[in-house]
């Protein structure tokens, strides 16, 4: 089994690295966090020009047809620079659902996502529903009237369209609607890492059959695949954070002197650096295994990957 990256994948990594180094330093990130929009429209436009917004979409829909490996490369590099642009919300979560669905109007929306003109958010989480997304409390009645509340909607304040999971009778259903539709209200807040989240309420929002993306088993499959892919991307982001933290700490210990010698000579710090390196490499290995399992859509594999990388990243950054 060849686990080496292809020439194209290596070039992609180098392209993203150069962009982040020149266009997205920590001060740039801080300016974005403090801004009202929670992302930089100019940076988002550059993402589109680089082709990154088109990466995971099928070629039939106007995308580049890249897969989980390329997305993982992208998010690893994003993790190194703590990029907070709403790529996960629009391209991964919402984009995956649209791209893999049989929704008739999906290509037009995907085209606008790829060009950077449109943000789409996936509203699936609800208060007191744990991690079971198969039976939402948000309802769509027989007259296609939507009622309910979603929480932790990534980039909800900036999205022009929303994909919402709901129950229509006993069937799980996914609907697509404009965020400014009458009856939709948004309360936005910032997450601990500076990203934008929203609680979105739907009160007697009138839809029709054209708003329905998928129902029943297809809706569940689309949600599962979308969340699994997003879990993989977040895990890759954590791996990138860990690697950057390790390299910066290593550089610091070599340059900082105490008692007439670099502190990297002190055994206790050497042990700490070794521990950081081992954690980082183990996380990378688990990420690679998850990338190889992505087509099997193994929920447990992605959950274990995220759990380990999150814990390891937390340990490494303390």
Regions found by a protein language model. Give the residues of each.
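Amphipathic, small/basic residue-rich leader segments at the start of a protein or domain
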Residues: 1-88, 108, 112
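Secondary-structure edge/capping motif, primarily at the C-terminal ends of alpha-helices
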Residues: 30-31, 253-260, 290-297
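Single conserved hydrophobic/aromatic residue that forms the stacking wall/gate
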Residues: 308-318
């Amino acid at each position: 089994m060849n686990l080496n990256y292809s020439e194209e994948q290596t070039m992609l990594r180098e392209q993203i690295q150069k962009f982040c180094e020149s266009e997205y330093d920590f001060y740039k990130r801080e300016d974005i966090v403090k801004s009202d929009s929670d992302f930089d429209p100019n940076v988002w436009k550059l993402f589109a020009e680089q082709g990154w917004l088109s990466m995971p979409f099928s070629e039939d829909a106007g995308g580049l047809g890249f897969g989980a490996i390329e997305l993982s490369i992208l998010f690893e590099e994003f993790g190194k620079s703590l990029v907070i642009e709403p790529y996960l919300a629009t391209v991964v979560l919402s984009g995956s659902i649209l791209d893999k669905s049989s929704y008739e109007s999906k290509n037009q929306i995907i085209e606008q996502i790829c060009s950077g003109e449109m943000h789409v958010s996936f509203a699936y989480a609800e208060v007191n529903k744990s991690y079971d997304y198969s039976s939402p409390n948000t309802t769509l009645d027989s007259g296609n009237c939507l009622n309910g509340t979603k929480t932790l909607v990534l980039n909800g304040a900036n999205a022009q369209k929303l994909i919402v999971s709901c129950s229509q009778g006993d069937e799980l259903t996914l609907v697509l609607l404009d965020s400014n539709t009458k009856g939709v209200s948004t309360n936005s807040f910032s997450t601990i890492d500076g990203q934008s989240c929203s609680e979105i309420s739907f009160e007697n929002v009138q839809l029709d059959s054209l708003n329905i993306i998928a129902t029943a088993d297809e809706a569940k499959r689309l949600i599962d695949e979308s969340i699994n892919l997003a879990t993989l991307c977040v895990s890759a982001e954590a791996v990138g954070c860990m690697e950057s933290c390790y390299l910066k700490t290593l550089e610091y210990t070599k340059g900082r002197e105490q008692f007439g010698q670099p502190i990297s000579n002190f055994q206790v710090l050497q042990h700490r650096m070794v521990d950081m390196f081992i954690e980082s490499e183990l996380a990378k290995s688990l990420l690679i295994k998850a990338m190889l399992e992505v087509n099997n859509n193994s929920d447990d594999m992605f959950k274990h990957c995220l759990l380990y990388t999150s814990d390891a990243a937390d340990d490494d950054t303390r």
